[in-house]
Amino acid sequence: MTLSEAIQSTVDNHPELHASVNDRLSADEDVKVAKGGYLPTVDLIAGYGREQTDSPSTRALGNHNKETLNYSDAELRLRQMLFDGFNTPNEVARTQATVNSRAYYIQGTAESLALRTVEVYLEVLKRREMVALARNNLQAHERVNDQIKLRSERGVGSTADLDQSEARLALAANNLYTEEVNLADAEANFFSSTGRLPDELEQPASVKGEVPENIELARQTVMDNNPYLKSAQADVYAAEKQYEVAKAPFYPRFDLELATSADDNVQGDEGHYNTWRAAVVMNYNLFNGMRDKARLQAAAHSINQSMDIRNNALRVLNENLALAWNAMENARMQTPKARDYADYTARSREAYQQQFSLGQRTLLDLLDSENELFTANRRYTEVRYTEEFSMYRVISAMGELLRKQNVVVPAEAVALTEVKSEARLPEMR
């Protein structure tokens, strides 16, 4: 399995991403609801019952003042919005902005899950190397311990040397057990992220060439390209359109109304009535208990809230980028030194073994060299994977991880229109 395949499996199967996709699909339906405001409404109203009427027409009949009849009525009515204070176009724009927000949020979720997949993928590879190092270290201790035990049995070695050798052997075995548990944990995390077991994992190529030359370029890419930031900007647009929607009640509403009706025995008059009408109807609210004004003010505050959320998102993303960049730079400086440490320690062990064959080193000296080599190799492995993962963190912060890994995201991750963030970091003084 390659790293790209692992990320693709995560994107295809992770429930967190599926939840975001369903959120987008729900927003798509809201757009259809909003566009329904452009279409006419057609209603059929019908009724049947008994009606008692006391009216001038019934009183004119003489003998009694009331008329009780079985009545029925039916009306077919069409109403087409002509002007609604720009409510419908602004509501359509608001829901479309929400769709864009959900689409970019899917992208952001996919980027986060991809980075998590990279983390668990590299962790499995690292832990497998750690297990191999611990196993080799244990085998080296067993060889030396066998030699010390043999010398002790022949009366050449001391009991103290044997005890010390046994203690170091126990520690080496314990180190192997610990690394095996760490590997099992890493494999469990891998399955949780990808939904697949980590069988044969290919070592991914280094992404050193994918990282910008300096943090300023990376920061600019974050501001231009990070999907979470674009999602927050789309929420700002949605809040602005919600403010325009809140203005609609301050305008009169005009509708074209077409209706036809058929009635029997209504209003105390026996007989059948057929009517039709065509009219432009105006509805203009003059006072609504100040509720419309309060809704407008609430929408204005929502705009400010969404802008603050967007600006805070940029600060968090910039912080994450800076931390990832610092970790990358630190690991880059440490990796060559850790490699030198491992190389020189390996040479020292070889020299110790040669000196031991000449009688210039003891078996305990060999154990010391084995422990030193194990520590050096563990350190080099740790720093090497830390450097690699920190580079992936930088790429993910820029919103480029999925693209560079050629991962196919769901169709719902595509926004209706491109969104450019207007957030800017405060000046650094």
Regions found by a protein language model. Name each.
Residues 52, 379-429:
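Acidic, low-complexity, intrinsically disordered peripheral segments
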Residues 71-73, 119, 164, 275-277:
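Transmembrane beta-barrel architecture of outer-membrane proteins
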Residues 215-263:
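Acidic, glycine-rich loop-and-beta core segments that form the ion-binding/anion-interacting portion
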Residues 18, 41-68, 79-108, 230, ...:
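Small/polar (Gly/Ser/Thr/Ala-rich) solvent-exposed segments
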Residues 7, 75-77, 121, 279-281, ...:
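Membrane-embedded beta-strand positions in outer-membrane beta-barrel channels/transporters
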Residues 1-7:
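Regulatory alphaC helix of protein kinase catalytic domains
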Residues 112-223, 324-327, 331, 372-373, ...:
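Periplasmic alpha-helical coiled-coil/stalk elements that build and connect Gram-negative outer-membrane
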Residues 19-34, 109, 113-132, 143, ...:
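Amphipathic alpha-helical coiled-coil segments
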